[in-house]
Amino acid sequence: MKKRNKPVIPGFGLSMGITISILSLVVLIPLASLVVYTAKLSFKDFIETITRARVLASFYTSFVCAFAAVVINGIMGTILAWVLVKYDFPGKRLMDGMIELPFALPTAVAGIALTSLTSDSGIVGSFFAGFGIKIAYTRIGITVAMIFVGIPFVVRSVQPVLEKMDNSYSEAAGVLGAKKTTIFWKVIFPELKPAIFAGTGLAFGRCLGEYGSVVFIAGNKPYYTEITPLVIMSELQEFDYSSATAIALVMLAVSFFILFLNSMIQQRNARILRGGNA
């Protein structure tokens, strides 16, 4: 009879109990409080709250800007990860460290810096202003801020895959006469796709909930540049907790659905790469 190895961490029951306790304190209880506060509203009041013109406009602004930022992050993040892994150049370590700057930098500081940079008197903003393009206090500015906070998720998700990627397949394809574009789309990209989806999914969730860095550059004009987190904050300042939690619950549900869909896509891609059924 084969002897089973004892687990390094003693006591499965104790470990599971601690895990569930931490998960409950950090995730489940705060989420349950949203449901409890929202339950104070009738279904009719709930629908009226989340379908107010100002709220719907904030949903549109948040989701459209977040989606645009995620698409750009997916492209730019993959390129950055590729450059950091495949090439050696002066300042590579500095650039690699700067990727994580949005994680360490206070969001308010990031917002002020981005606003100063993209305003009409800023270095970047004044350049685009010459072409009649305004960045700060527009949806373009919101998208820029979301790109800033979201791009590390894509880079850090793609980097490990590139570092561990077996180059023999792409080299074999090159020997057989395949073009570089064909090698990338047919050999390299399928292996990167799960990591890109993972990074963009996390970035999308971060962009939707971002407040500090966006609120400074947005201009907060109702029905145009007002993001949903700001509407929630306004409701809280008016002590309307039920309305605030109702709006937050919608954001939570949509974010959870997108992350769940992203996870399903990753699992499907992983099965395809392992040679399983799609």
Model-based region annotation:
Residues 104-111:
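Transmembrane alpha-helices and adjacent helix-loop boundaries
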Residues 7-12, 46, 53, 211-265:
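Interhelical loop and adjacent transmembrane-helix boundary motif
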Residues 2-7, 43-51, 56, 91-92, ...:
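Membrane-interfacial helix termini and adjacent extracytoplasmic/periplasmic loops
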